[in-house]
Structure formats: structure tokens, C-alpha cells
Amino acid sequence: MEAVVTSSQTVRAEVAELLGIEESALDPDADLIASGLDSIRMMSLSGRWRKQGIDVRFAAMAANPTVAAWTRLVGERTAESPGAATQSGDTAASAGDPDAPFPLAPIQHALWVGRNELTELGGVAAHLYVEFDGAGVDPERLRTAAAALAARHPMLRVDILGDGMQRISDRDLPVKVTDLRHLDVADAEQQLEVIRHAKSHQLLEGEVLELALTLLPDGRTRLHVDLDMQAADAVSYRNFMADLAALYRGAQLPELQYTYRQYRSAFTATPAPTVDEDRRWWTERIPDLPEPPALPLVPRAEQRDPRRGTRRWHFLDTDIRDRLFAAARARGITPAMAFAASYAGTLARWSTSRHFLLNLPMFGREPFHPDVDKLVGDFTSSLMLDVDFTEAHTPAQRARVMQEALHTSAEHATYSGLSVLRDLSRHHGSPSLAPFVFTSALGLGDLFAGDVTDQFGTPVWHISQGPQVLLDAQVTPFDGGLLVNWDVREDAFRPGVIDAMFAYQLAELERLAADDAAWDAADPPAVPPAQRAVRDAVNDTGARRSDDALHDGFFRTAAHTPDATAVIGSTGTLTYAELRERVLAVTGALQVAGIKPGDTVAVMGPKCADQVTALLAIHAAGAVYVPIGADQPADRADSILQTAGVRMALACGDEPPTFLPALTIAEAVRVGSRVHGVTPATVEPDRVAYVLFTSGSTGAPKGVEVTHAAAMNTLEFINDHFGIGPSDRSLALSTLEGDLSVLDVFGMLRAGGSLVVVDEAQRRDPDSWARLIAEHSVTVLHWMPGWLEMLLEVGGALPSVRVVPTGGDWVRTEMVRELRRAAPGVRFAGLGGATETAIHNTICEPGELPREWSAVPFGRPLPNNACRVVAADGADCPDWVPGELWVGGRGIARGYRGRPDLTAERFVVHDGRTWYRTGDLVRYLPDGQIDFVGRADHRVKISGYRIELGEVEAALRRIAGVEAAVAAVLTAPGDGRGEQLAAIVRASSPAVTVDELTRRMAELVPPHMVPSHIALVEAVPFTVGGKIDRRAVTAELTRSMAERANAQAPTYRVPSTALERALADIVSTVLDRDSVGADDDFFELGGDSVLATQAVARIREWLDSPGVMVTDIFAARRVGALARRLVDHESGSDRLEGVAELYLEVADMNSADVASALHSTSAQASR
């Protein structure tokens, strides 16, 4: 046993060694962070002491980073654990037969499993590929050096076996030579590019290191080094490349007296004393750990090449490095954490959440033997960091948050990050990954030593990639400065995202190096200049503005074309002159009743053509209208009347309400016809035109005050854009409570066209709509998407319809295609908007519908409007990043009547402008269009993951045969799993099945976004207002889930064959369960890659099935399917069944039976 040393001199010596300085130069009271000691080396030292049984915690070291303080800590902890000692290299030297297989290290195992296509983000080898551009490298000398290198480092000859073990082989390390000296320079470069592309993405099979040399014109050479990082980590790469260079120049290297195999044996034999405590600490935090950063990703099934890796890199020179390091250390921040914070801050800016999980690889070697630092192998571990930048708004604040997160996690680092991820997977019931990685090689020395570049040339191309990683950001010393690399799964990200992110981080690093004040300054905009230019162009607030009030256009038309048809209703037709006469009569009646400009008048009762007269008359009196439909509950109607401050009411029908001053519209016409000299009032455009009451999130009505100017901005654009004129007729389907009625009434009558009014008896009947369209040759349908869906389901041609602007809900692309078939030549547009944005605020008029669209985007802002996509901290989101839609400009409402608190909350001032916060989650596309993602109040959390229901719906709609989909969250009856994700789907064909939908969703979205229940329906329910009826959807799903629960009581298929029974016994043992059915899912029962490896090892040994692989368990998942795969491997079941019966016979024995059988066998053998 090696005594633990606690003297000041020893602590000082260890720290001096880590800093690379003489012990005498180290002041015991100096701040070690300011002296250059980084977090990674501090963690290594803490881990070394804890391995020795001295419980010195990393956080305690970081709190007071001096040699003197650490000496006291070591002394105190040693006194508490007087028996502290560590196993020496000698006692650990025996590691069994050196030719026998030995277990993979945890990171090795994860990389091995990740090569499997069936794992999420898998099918990729962890490899590092580098090209050295040099001159005069001799192929034979290189071959000789390579052979010596392979002999020196056994791990460069390792075989990774199918059961999760590894074994050292006796193969050599060949060098492939390609001679391109006969080509000209251009052709040689082209061939180099071909070689590079092949090697950058290859899966090495049967070898872990490939050396190749290309001979180029003019004596140049290119050395290609491709390493499978299952065999060696980055520090090991540096080691063997330095050895290769030394061997190439003829140096004699002393033989290593220790092996990686021995190291792993010693490591396993000396677990950290705090591992159980650390496991408990992490277990308590599992439910609260965040998900990875939610960046703009492309569904895997839509990626061109899911495995393609690319690299972005940038070199920071010595001056920038030194200034960054000095500024960080002056703030008590290690340089590694400064770089980590810059990377994480960039992720936060492109993520929908500023609270996420980050993966940090850690490099550390226990000093079991003097040769440990010279070995080649995998010595890495991982650390999960809970990063929360919610309240961190400057680079310095983020760096402190990162450093504190590191200190917290490092305190409990003996329980590995991989173990944490496995625990998370079990907690969530689906695979949990941490695919965003930050790798710091600061303090580890140059990856490419000077001797390496002297012998082989300058590294001109390098890339690394790994399974289950989307983005690995690295910072490493290089050529006197720092190399900042991003290795990216390129096609996983939306176009332009990675380039914008990388540029943003580099700009921050250079800003922090140049200006010390930048560390404490707010962040600059993340929207790149090119994206800003596109947004400036589409957010045009300088278009022509009308000073008209809403009713002015009607009166001009009535003066110019009095005999034209204005209104067509179920009771008759009115010309413009007739309508004007009725309007002025009702205006007179209002004046007689004491209504003054600015007063509020309700329009009540069932939908009817007379309501057109009422609206125009109220405005002609200078008043404000408030519609209240016939189907409003009495309490709600009373609340609206009180909040709006209604002075009187005009009502459709024969009987006016009795609870306030009121007239029927017909009575108002009679009363007003006796009033002479009535003229329409002149109303300033900034006066309120109407108050529409909508339901808030609490269900309480809120009255939106919309001015004439705001509504006119939308109305004029629609009329001008679509050329709506005297020959047009629109079918007015919307009730007055829906703001589409504003365009129906005031827009059409301003244009001189005719309004065909659907009455109360017809407004729920699509057959009546189709008849009215045909009968009156309707040309314009300004409708909700749900109404169009209902109309198209009725069927039939719509030859007269030429313009269909629709908005207010999702617009299916397939519905647009159906509409174009029914109405050839129709001009269709999808519009985004809300009552608070004066009906519409964006427009998308698509030509050919792109295949990848599942719904029509909101589009671009209307003239005189502007749109922002805003993150939770108020900053503008870059392209593709979802945020809340804010709308500003002429077309927004004044606020909420009688609710100054709500007005202040939803109508906010930013940069001197008022913006309406819509609550819609949207994203800017690169062409300036705004794409609807979902509602903020439809953002839910399932199994610890935040989910946008709109994203789930969009993914479902991308599946062939799906016409419509609506997602919801609800609790299954009698189910103990809590809230679940569910969806209804309307399909175009009976061939679309729930199983097929589930399978395709698994290809498009992460597991937590795949609905656990899907119900196929004949129709999606809509409200009377034409929007998806989500309450009805929830009711339908609740009913469907209850039916399924009743029909599918938990089933358990007993394993039927001997092989199934044997496999079930092995699997149940590995999973620590009483029993496993033939159709039970291994992973749903709590299995993971480590347990799968254990199961494979036992199946190989106990069932004599050496061909079984971990991939078989990933593919089969169930005992029954696994049995079939094993039989297929052997082209028959007889032998396996016999072995399984023997296994079961032994498994059923008790210990006494086994001892007796062994004794009997021994006795027979002796005879």
C-alpha cells in the first residue's frame, strides 16, 4: 500500500506539476486560478485524492484555490480517514491473461453501442481524422515506425467484440500509400478531396487506427490519420502521434511497463469511496434535471444524410488568448469555464429554453503507475451540467453560473454522466441523450506536438464526430494560440443555423478579448446582419395610409352607384341607395335615443342581414359597436354589457332585450325615418370603431378596442391586394363577434361589391353555403379554415370563387390543394392575425406548395405592420428559433376596455413603439416569412420534456395520408403514468393505421414527442366560429383511451418454447424482475445498453450462442423476437432448443441439487 502524503511540500509539488512550473516558483498563498490552474486539472487532483480515500471535494478546493488552503483540507480529511491509502501500480499489475477479453470502459461502451443504427443518433463511429501536409515523408520509414508503434501500444491493435468486451490482437499497423505524383497540382488536390470525403465519414471495421500516405507532386506528402476513439482518447492521440514522430526519426523509446488493461483492472478494483453517496445525490435530482438545448433541428427522416459530420474552426492567436485568459482569471473564472459559458450562451440564444443539460467530457488518469500518462486508451469520463441562464444576462454572469454548475456537478463526479443519463432514461421511459458537448483541452498541451509537425507537416484538415452527439464544441491549444472547433452533425440542423451560431460565439470571444467592459455588458443582438436586412425589408411601416373611417367607403359607393346591389339576405335584396336610406334612418333613431359620438351601442340577437344596417348606422352616429350573439349565455352577455359601458342596443328579430334601452333594427328604421337632415358623422381615424369580446385564458371575456385606423389598414390592403371591386360578391358567414365580419361588411361595401349574408338558420349548414355560393355566383370567401374544410367535404365545384383569404387557425396544405381543384384559378392566401391586430397582420399567398410544408405559414407582415419574434428575455430570435410573436404598427388595437392591467401586460413598449404580445409561438424563416409553431398556452411538459403541441401536429401532418391532426395532453383512465401525449388523426385512406403513424412519428420526432395514444377519426371537430374545438378533441381522446383501456387489459404472453423460457429467465435476472413475458419490451422494462450487454454475455455463455450481439437486443426488443433471431442465425432451432432445455433444468435446481450433480459427474469421470 502507498501511504497518503499530506505535507505542504507534497501538495505543492503536485500542483506545480499540473501547472508545469518549478515547485520553488509556486507561492503557497497564490490564487491558483489566477496562476493558470483550470477546473479540469483541479478536478483531476480532487479525484486523485478521493481515490486515495481523502474526501477533498472539488467545490471546497475551488472556494479557496491556494496550496496552503488545500494542504489544510488534505490534512483535515486524512485525519478523518486515517486508513486512507491507494493501491499501487504493483498490486494492480496483475490483470489476468493478457490475451483474454476484458470489459470496455464506460465511455468505450457508449461509443460501441452508438455505432448501432437502432440507437437514437446512432450509426456513427467515434473517430478523429487528421491530415498533415508535409514534404518528403518516406513510406518505408513510416511503415517501420508504424510497426513499432503498434508493438508499443496494444490498444492500437484492439478488437471490439460483439458482446461488449475487447481483446488485444497481434495484427500489425499497415500504411497504405497512394502515389499521385504523376498528376498536376489541380488534379492531385481533387483526388485528395475524394480521399478526405471517404475517410472523414468512414466506419473503421476490424481496426482502430488507419495510417495512409499520399505522395503528391513537387515532393509534397499528405499523411492521413484516422482513429477510432473507442481505442484512444484525445490525450492518447497526442501520445501516440508523438511516439510515431519519434520512432520515424529513429529514436529508441523505452518499453512501457504498464498497460491499459492493467489500468482498467486497477481502476475497477479501487472504486471511489463516495460513489454511493454521489449516486444518491444524483438520484434525488433526476426529476428536476432539464432537457438538452432545444435548437432548430430537422426531423431525422427528412435529413439528407443523418451521419454527415462537418467542422467549423477558428484560430485565436496568442494575443487574444492571453487577454481572454487574463480577463477571466481577474474575475476568478477559469479560462475553460469562460469558453464553456460562451458556447453555452450561444446555445441558449438559439434554444427555446435558457435552462438545459450540457455534456462535459473529462480527462483524468489515476497515478497507478509511472507509465500511466504515456499509455494509449480511453481514460475519459463525462459530467452532466445543469445550466440555467434564466437570470444571467452578461458574459461574466454566465461564466459564474457555468463555474458554479461545474463545481456542483464535480462534487459528485464519481457517479458518471453516463449513469445519470441511464437513470434519466428510466425516469422518462424513453432514451435520454445529452447531444450538446463542450470539450476543453486547456491544460493538456498541444494536440499536435512540435516534433509531430516537424516530421509530418502542418495539420491542414481535421474533424471528429461521435454517436449520439449533435454538436461538440472544443477548445484546444494549437500553435501558440487556441483552436476553437465545432464538430457538427450537419444535416440535423436547419440551414444557416450553425454558421450563425459559430459566428456569434467567435464575435463574443473577440469582443471579450478586446474590451474588458464587454464582460459585464448586455448581449448584442443575435440576429445576424443578413437576417436583419431581410426583416427590415419585410417589416415596411411606410406604406400609404387611409384617413377614412370604416363607414366612409360605403357612403361614397352609395353616392356613385346607388342602384348597385349591396346586400342579399334571406328576406330580400337592398341596393346601395336603399341601404343608405335605412342606415341614416337608424342613425336618426340613435340620435333621438341620445346616442352621442363615442358612445357604445350593442348589436344583439341572431345573425341576420339587418345587422349590416346596424353597424353602418352606429358608425354614422359616431358611436362604437359591440356585438353580442344570440347564443351567448346570459351571465356572459351581462358581463360584456357592463364592461363595455353599453348605452343601448339594436337587435335583430322581433323582440328587443328588456334589460337595457333597446330597439329592434326594424323598429329603429321606422323611428328614424321621421328624423330629417341626418348625415353621417365625420370620425377621426384614431377613434375606437368597435369592441370585440374574446375569451381569455381564464375564460373571462376581454373587450378588444379597435380603432378605425387599425381596421382600415387591414381592409384597404385586402381590397387592393386582391383587386376586390364592384363585380365581387362575398358570402358573409362570420358572426359579428368574429372580426372577419369587419372585412365582409366594410371591405365589400367600400369596394362596391355585394354582400350575401348567411342568416342564423344557415350558418351551421355547409350545404346551404354551397347552395348560396352557386346561386349568387359568390367570388370571395373570407373564411376561417374550418369552414373551408366543411365546405370542401360537402363536395362540388366552386367555379365562381376567385379569392379566398383565410386565417385564424392552421391551414392545411392539402386543403389548399383541394380548394384549387374545386375552384381552378382561385387566389388563395393564408393570413395570420388576432382580434388585437385588427383581423390580420401577416399574409402568405403561396404558389406551388413546397412538399415539406404541413401547413401554410403566417407569411410576411402586412404594410404598415411590423413583426418581432421574441425570446423569453425580450431579445429577437434568430431565424428558425421559435419565440413569441409581437406585432406593432398601425394595425394593432388600442387595448382592452376597462382592463388597464391586462393592456399593460399584453401591449408593451419597446424601442419607443407599442407591440402586442400575441401568445403565438412562431419563427422567422430565412426568406422573411413567419411560420406558426403553436400557442404558448399549448406548450406542455411530458415526462420532463417541454413539448409544443403544434410541433407534434405538424409532424403528424407530414406523414403521407394524414389530412389533419390535433394533439392534446390528458391522463389515461386507470393509468399510473400521469399525463400522456395523445392525438386525433383524420386520414385520407383506410390504409393509414395507428401502428404506421406511430412508426413514422418515431422517425420524425424524438421519442417523447410520439403520442402514446392516437385515435383515427372521420372528422376533426370545429367550433361554430370555425376554429378547432380542442375541448371536443380532448373529450374524444378521453373516450377513445377509455375504450382501449377496457378492450386491452394488460396482457402477458407466457414464453412458449424452451428457448423463449430460457431467454426470459436470463432477461428477468438482468433486469431484476420476477418474470418477463415473451412480448414485453426490454427497454420499457428498464433495460438500457449496459444491461443489454450483460444479457448478451449471459446468453453467449449459458446458451452457447456466440453469434448473439447487442444489436440483436436493440432490433428484437422482446424475448419472442430475440428467440426468432437466434434461430435464424443458426438456420434451425433444434440445437438451441436442446441447450435451452439443459439451461432450464440447471436453473431449476437448488444449490444442493447442483452440488450433487457435479459430484456425480466427477465420480463418473474418475472411473
UniProtKB/Swiss-Prot annotation:
Gene Ontology cellular-component terms listed: cytoplasm
Annotated ranges, domain Carrier: 2-78, 1054-1130
Organism, scientific name: Mycobacterium sp. (strain MCS)
Family: Belongs to the ATP-dependent AMP-binding enzyme family. MbtB subfamily.
Residue ranges, annotated region (Adenylation): 575-967
Primary enzyme class: ligase
Gene3D superfamilies in the record: 3.30.300.30, ACP-like, Chloramphenicol acetyltransferase-like domain, N-terminal domain of ligase-like, Nonribosomal peptide synthetase, condensation domain
Disordered: annotated segments: 78-100
Record protein name field: Phenyloxazoline synthase MbtB
Assigned EC number: 6.3.2.-
Keyword Protease tagged: no
The protein's required cofactors: pantetheine 4'-phosphate
Co-factor remark: Binds 2 phosphopantetheines covalently.
Annotated function: Involved in the initial steps of the mycobactin biosynthetic pathway. Putatively couples activated salicylic acid with serine or threonine and cyclizes this precursor to the hydroxyphenyloxazoline ring system present in this class of siderophores.
Domain observations: Modular protein that contains an aryl carrier protein (ArCP) domain which bears a phosphopantetheinyl arm to attach the activated salicylic acid, a condensation/cyclization domain involved in the formation of the oxazoline ring, an adenylation domain which activates the serine or threonine residue into an aminoacyl-AMP ester, and a peptidyl carrier protein (PCP) domain which bears a phosphopantetheinyl arm to attach the activated serine or threonine.
A single GO molecular function term of this UniProt record: ligase activity
SUPFAM superfamilies xrefs: Acetyl-CoA synthetase-like, ACP-like, CoA-dependent acyltransferases
Superkingdom of the source species: Bacteria
Alphabetical keyword list: Ligase, Multifunctional enzyme, Phosphopantetheine, Phosphoprotein, Repeat
GO terms under biological process: amino acid activation for nonribosomal peptide biosynthetic process; lipid biosynthetic process; secondary metabolite biosynthetic process
Sites bearing O-(pantetheine 4'-phosphoryl)serine, chain numbering: 39, 1089
